[in-house]
Regions:
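Acidic/His-rich active-site region of diverse nucleotide-sugar glycosyltransferases
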Residues: 71, 101-186, 194
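Glycine-rich, basic loop-to-helix element that forms the pyrophosphate-binding segment
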Residues: 62-80, 90
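Non-catalytic, C-terminal membrane-associated alpha-helical segments of glycosyltransferases
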Residues: 229-236, 248-287
Length: 287
């Protein structure tokens, strides 16, 4: 018997994207799955009803409070009935079956705790966003998506263990949630998937990149590429992340100093040159 995948996605004022993602799944994905949409307190209270009316076979859960990225996914997980869970951004597009490749990778080794597919841009399908991740610097608290902004010319066709999954698509076994827990909700937005990957690895499990599965991502569709929201939470959550993962006090202090001096001044300079003065207060708010 084939074990089902529960696909969990969050809708927040993103009805058009959510509809396009679900329709692309319906057209291209044949592996057994259920779809759970968490409406994260969209400002239009009818969005969840419109989704349920258009797609009567999916579950639509309305939260009256915006629970953030982790909280919304955790709510969806509590309704899931599948053996596997796929946390999938609503601003993604599917053009070919991909669930079987993710499932096969998860099942290939009991040590594998989480798998992300190859992720490319939409509509620039030949331009990559993710083919794995570099380790994170303990000082800058930054890492890089392998292959980011490169043309996909077949150079990333080998599955491999990697440092972090990509928050746009993360597959796990439902039973493993008991081992490494759900996503931490106090971040609200950004860094929660990095924290979650760290917790997964602390249990002895590994993170993998699977190139046989590919999806396309309209990056930052819900919050904007350089919105005040993004600037605030990135700044704030780096400091929270440092507090949680850096066990050595000296390294943690060095990271704090870097974030609140060099990184802050660099961002202020960039926003000044770009005449994006309205973003500068959100840097200080995050600190």
């Amino acid at each position: 018997m084939i074990k089902k995948v529960s696909i969990i996605t969050i809708n927040y004022n993103g009805l058009k994207d959510t509809v396009e993602m679900i329709e692309s799944l319906a057209i291209h994905e044949t592996y057994p799955h259920e779809i759970i949409v968490v409406d994260n307190a969209s400002t239009d209270p009818l969005e969840h009803k419109l989704l349920q009316s258009k797609f009567p076979d999916i579950q639509v859960i309305r939260s009256e409070k915006n629970l953030g990225f982790a909280g919304g996914n955790n709510l969806g997980i509590s309704y899931a009935t599948g053996y596997y869970l796929l946390l999938l951004n609503n601003d993604t597009i599917i053009t070919q079956p991909f669930l079987k490749a993710l499932v096969n990778r998860l099942d290939s080794n009991p040590r594998i705790g989480c798998v992300s597919p190859k992720i490319a841009c939409w509509p620039e399908k030949e331009r990559l966003q993710y083919a794995g991740s570099t380790p994170m610097s303990h000082i800058t608290l930054r890492n890089t998506s392998i292959g980011y902004d490169q043309l996909d010319q077949g150079q990333f066709e080998e599955a491999h263990e990697t440092s972090f999954a990509h928050g746009a698509a993360m597959a796990v076994k439902a039973i493993d949630i008991q081992k490494f827990g759900k996503m931490p909700e106090f971040y609200f937005l950004y860094y929660e998937e990095l924290d979650w990957c760290t917790q997964i690895q602390k249990t002895g499990s590994s993170i993998w990149f699977e190139p046989k599965a590919i999806i396309y991502h309209k990056e930052s569709a819900s919050v904007g590429i350089e919105s005040p929201l993004r600037i605030y939470y990135h700044t704030r959550n780096r400091l929270i992340f440092a507090q949680r993962i850096l066990s050595k006090k000296r390294i943690r202090i060095c990271s704090y100093i870097y974030q609140t001096t060099f990184a802050l001044c660099k961002k202020i300079l960039i926003f000044t040159i770009q005449a994006k003065f309205h973003l500068i207060p959100f840097l200080f708010k995050g600190i």
